[in-house]
Amino acid sequence: MTRNIAEEIKRLKEEKNAVLLAHYYVRPEVQEIADYIGDSFYLSKLAVGLEAQTIVMCGVSFMGESVKILNPEKTVLLPDASADCAMAHMASVETIEQMRKTWDDLAVVCYINSTAELKRHSDVCVTSANAVKIVKALPNKNIFFIPDRNLA
């Protein structure tokens, strides 16, 4: 990224009352101009307390969705709409519906790295740091962990 582009981005952030969040996995030159850098959960939580009216989320699509869910009144931009995470699509709404028909007393536990659509059809959303604690506290006898059973 050239110095001129970085300066223009800084100018636009100030002009538009915007903040730039960058995930650890984005290119270093993007991280250099970011206001905050972190993992998806940290950035989502951080966004709630920001005064900026526009949040630019430099990461994959589920990260932008998570920020928007927590900040419905703000404009959330995703610079690369094609940026995606394969894990976010490893489960489907149809699979959730089928599991609910098959198992009584089912709790659908969704990992944060999932699409907003999957989160909407889940009972609870967890991170790797709190998944065990939350699942142990659930009263349900049947747990369906999505999107990837290896995370469970």
Show where each model-derived region lies:
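Active-site loop-to-helix "anion-binding N-cap" substructures in soluble metabolic enzymes
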Residues: 1-152
